[in-house]
Amino acid sequence: MDFKYDVIVIGAGHAGCEAAAAAANLGSKTCLITMDMNKVAQMSCNPAVGGIAKGQIVREIDALGGYMGLVTDQTAIQFRILNRSKGPAMWSPRAQCDRNKFIWAWREILENIPNLHIWQDTVKEIIVENGEVVGLKTFWDVTFHARCIVLTAGTFLNGLMHVGKTQLPGGRMAEPASYKLTESIAKHGIEYGRMKTGTPVRIDGRSVHYELMDTQDGECDFHKFSFMNTSVRHLKQLQCWTCFTNEEAHNVLRNGLADSPLFNGQIQSIGPRYCPSIETKIVTFPDKEQHQLFLEPEGETTQELYLNGFSSSLPMEIQIEALKKIPAFKDLVIYRPGYAIEYDYFDPTQLKHTLESKKIKNLFFAGQVNGTTGYEEAGGQGIIAGINAHINCHGGEPFTLARDEAYIGVLIDDLVTKGVDEPYRMFTSRAEYRILLRMDDADMRLTERAYKLGLVKEDRYALLKSKREAVENIVNFTRNYSIKAALINDALENLGTTPLRQGCKLIDLINRPQITIENISEYVPAFKRELDKITDERKEEILEAAEILIKYEGYIGRERIIADKLARLESIKIKGKFDYDSLQSLSTEARQKLKKIDPETIAQASRIPGVSPSDINVLLVLSGR
């Protein structure tokens, strides 16, 4: 065999799969190294994809030509749109997936991508010559040669699991950790630290009293993750269930805190703020009498259930005893206990926006090794790292996404500019341009860029063009079509909105909250005929996109103006221009932070914590602005 590659990806989690697929689809000879081919894209925790802001990231991955959205649609067993009561900037898709089918769907994709080879092994060392990565060595004593390497090792780097006082080395339950690799990277001056995450018990569904729980059903409308997928749901759609903890369960948990690794000093690492363990919840919120739990199926052919909201590293017997105090779990049987895991991560401020290391040329980092948490955040980083690894091999301009282009852009900019002191999770609140970053228009924002890059093929690009044309036709029709008051007022009263005193444009009516494109079209024959011209299977998607553009035109325009103004600061390049230690007009903190991050632009400098507006003014003056 030939062990020489353009790009090697270490780790086949969600970041690694997207990175390897992107590099190979762009034409790089690529190798994906994983410990276990039967665990590619394993959902290590919750068997679900998407959620608030995370769903938008998956849509963006899909718009760029990635696969997470397609695999999710193919293996979803429940689909919902979250935040429907809010505006479209806040809508987020989420799906429960069949855990095992998700793995096999991804594996089928990977095994059929030209230029992509999978190797089952464990990497122990990267090879660096003259400040540039050139290869790696594995525990099978195989030496690989590579022009670029992407590290996507997840929680496996020196992973250590905790259940009560029991500690067990590993990257996941019953899977070995990866040793020596962190140290082989750190010896080249790259800083690293430790983080912690956790997962709940897995329950035997035959022991659950479902009649004592509330049901949570999915939705069966046109929404999906992939812009390519117009088919109905592939798998049988299943229910989830909800219930609450109670004071009896809390007392059991409190009595066990002395044996909790989180509270007895056994775990020193920082865990995810927005996904706390059940023991953290009862300590942080002592007055709260109950906490909601979600019981979620792991697949359509298994009894295994995931208990969302009950992550724990308490001793197994305490976890079981506490759960048995909840009526629905009074006869509880589990497949395995919850556990916590500590792992190594690398400070992401040591990376460029391409996710390439600033210290080792052609070495890229993506996913949980950068201090993030979540499959979606990992996948978003993975596709960007894979694209740029290919570009480093074959030439071209670096591919980055701005904060007004994508949640992926917000994510990466936050990582490389601000760094992390706890596992980073994406929220809509982290994006200052979230009206521009809606779930409905990820294809409009990103697919053309990916097409020019060569990652998006003709079929996807043709779908984008036809959708864009249809949406523009609808919006233009409503702008130009006039309606007389006498002909529409009866309809307006039927729709529960105020009659007109004089004629107006159709777009003005659609801007009313009671009016939608579909309900007003029933009373405007010319508009109905215009909509009937749309024979595309994606008609509902097209109508939704057009309606959002109409109803939120003012907000979108205002945010676009703000983004464009700030974009001017993005054009002022400062990397390598200043000796920050010598700039006494800057604050001490600003000098330290600017020296460490070495920002590319004035705009990036302005987002560094500790760099004040007055510091930015100093840099602008020194830049001749």
Curated annotation (Swiss-Prot):
One of its GO terms (biological process) is tRNA wobble uridine modification. InterPro entries: FAD/NAD-bd_sf, GIDA_C_N, MnmG, MnmG-rel, MnmG-rel_CS, MnmG_C, MnmG_C_subdom, MnmG_C_subdom_sf. NAD(+) binds at residues 271-285. FAD binds at residues 11-16, 123, 178, 368. Transmembrane segments: none annotated. Keywords: Cytoplasm, FAD, Flavoprotein, NAD, tRNA processing. Its main location: cytoplasm. It is found in: Cytoplasm. PROSITE patterns: GIDA_1 (PS01280), GIDA_2 (PS01281). GO terms for cellular component: cytosol. Its cofactor is FAD. Signal peptide: none annotated. One of its GO terms (molecular function) is flavin adenine dinucleotide binding. NAD-binding protein involved in the addition of a carboxymethylaminomethyl (cmnm) group at the wobble position (U34) of certain tRNAs, forming tRNA-cmnm(5)s(2)U34. Homodimer. Heterotetramer of two MnmE and two MnmG subunits. Belongs to the MnmG family. This is tRNA uridine 5-carboxymethylaminomethyl modification enzyme MnmG. It comes from Bacteroides fragilis (strain YCH46). The gene is mnmG.
